[in-house]
Amino acid sequence: SGKDGTIRHVFSCVNPQGCNVKSFKSPTEEENLHDFLWRIYAHLPEKRMIQIFNRSHYEDILFPAVHGLIDKKEIQERHEVINKFEEHLQNNNTIILKFYLHISKKEQHKRLEARLTNPEKKWKYNADDKKESKKWSDYMDAYQNVLEGCNKHNPLVIIPADEKWYRN
């Protein structure tokens, strides 16, 4: 969806001393030994700092839901925990802005193909990307569920991201 490029573009004029970026990948073995928000806590911003999450705690609902690793009850519980977590942060003067960069299925396919064929993009390719792209509909359902369940205190803003000029 262009998360890295969007972060670079949007925050290009921000003093880097006041801004941190954390990219969350699949949970590590150690992270899996704790509750799903444990890995997030260490990266919460200090007062007067900007903390950017490239991916976030929402991934800890999406991937497990799509792969049947958690049931509907646990999905609902995670929604509630996230809503309480975000409310707590806001009550302690943390401003939360949430953005979802949405790309179409066609655009996702195009970008995956570019990673395979364009030498400048091959480094981005992950063999799991192709497999995960086949679960497009399941991911869209999971995203819809998160959008409805985790917007209690502040909405997740959906940004059409097929076109870089619009996304950025």
Language-model regions, residue ranges each:
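Glycine-rich phosphate-binding loop of ATP-dependent small-molecule kinases
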Residues: 1-168
